């Protein structure tokens, strides 16, 4: 199963660059504060997504070989172009993996307590200076000069699109069919 569906080098590298792990960034307006739970109360926390076997069995996942949906280098695609709405409209039938170049990025709401764009995920930076970029604890608040490349799955792309205003060029998009876990992988669970 795995040999038949392995990624090519380009889609594998895009997957590695898009992966971000858990979202653990705290509220930037509560930095250096100790938040106490009132006496007699319990702190509340839910992390259902970490119940991995349950998630694997209950929800569709991206499977199969990646399909090149869009590439800016291909002349026939350049004519039609590609935008974020089009990519997001592919979900839930398809999972997407997108490489995009971003310019002039800023939070839609300056009071956003947990900005999503990680400075560490800003690859191939071009003409970005400290005066042209505003960040807080490793999260991008605004970029007024220069550009960068980032890699997003469809969930990350949706969050970036909701939290930020920005100009962009879609460079490449791979899609994967979302489906239930194949029986050969589900049986051991």
Can you name each region flagged by the protein language model?
Residues 1-189:
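Conserved acidic
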């Amino acid at each position: 199963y795995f040999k038949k569906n392995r990624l090519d080098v380009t889609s594998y590298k895009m997957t590695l660059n898009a992966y971000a792990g858990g979202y653990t960034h705290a509220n930037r307006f509560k930095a250096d504060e100790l938040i106490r739970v009132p006496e007699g109360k319990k702190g509340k926390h839910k992390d259902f997504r970490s119940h991995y076997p349950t998630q694997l069995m209950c929800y569709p996942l991206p499977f199969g070989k990646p399909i090149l949906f869009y590439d800016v280098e291909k002349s026939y695609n350049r004519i039609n172009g590609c935008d974020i709405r089009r990519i997001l409209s592919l979900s839930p039938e398809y999972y997407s993996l997108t490489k995009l170049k971003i310019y002039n990025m800023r939070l839609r709401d300056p009071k956003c307590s947990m900005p999503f764009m990680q400075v560490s995920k800003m690859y191939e930076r071009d003409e970005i200076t400290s005066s042209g970029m505003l960040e807080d604890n490793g999260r991008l608040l605004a970029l007024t000069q220069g550009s960068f490349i980032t890699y997003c799955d469809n969930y990350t792309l949706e969050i970036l699109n909701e939290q930020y205003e920005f100009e962009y060029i879609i460079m490449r998009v791979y899609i994967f069919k979302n489906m239930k876990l194949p029986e050969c992988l589900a049986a051991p669970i």
